[in-house]
Amino acid sequence: LVTGMGALTPIGNDVATSWENAVNGVSGAGPITHFDASLFKTQFACEVKGFNGADHFDRKKLRQLDLYAQYAVVAARQAVADAGLKDDEKLNRNRVGVIVAAGIGGLHTFEEEAGYYAMNQANGPKYNPFFIPKMIADIASGHISMEFEYHGPNYGVVSACASSNNAIIDAFNLIRLGKADVMVTGGAEAAVYPAGVGG
C-alpha cells in the first residue's frame, strides 16, 4: 500500500505537476545548464528545473549533501507529508526504514574533489572531509533517516537503471517479512555533469 509520494523530476518539482505534465506529453529535455556543454557532442539533457538547494537546506546542511541527496531528501519530505507521517506521534520510528537507490550517487562531488586534488598535488593530498560521506550512494537514505529519526532498516541500492525498482521491491519485502511497518523508498540521481554526459 503506497500512502504518500514525492517527486522532483525534469517535468515537475512535485507529484501533481509531474503527473499533469506527463499526461499532457510535456518533455523534460532541454539545453544543459549544470555546466558548459558546448564542447560535448550531446548538449541536451533532462534536468530538474528551478531547484535551488538553499530554498530547502541551511548552509551547513548543503555542505554535507551532493545534489542527488538533496533531491532525495526533498522528495522524501513530500512523501512523508503526503502520507501523513510527519507528525504521527503513534508511529514507531524503530519500525520505519529507508531505502533510497542511486545508479551512481554523488558524481558531482567526485568530480569536484578529483579535480581539486589534481590541481593541488604539489601541496600534498587534501580532500574535503565531506568527500566520501557526500559521494557514497547510500548517504541519501542516511540523511532521510536522520531528519525524520527513523531507526528501521536503512541502506542504498545500486543496480544501474533498475536501482529504484529494486529499492521498492526490497522495501515491500521488508514489510511483507515483518521487518518494518513503514518504508520510505525510491531513487534519486543527479548525473548531468561532464563525467556523466561524456562518460
Residues covered by each model-derived region:
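ACP-dependent fatty acid/polyketide chain-elongation machinery
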Residues: L1-K61
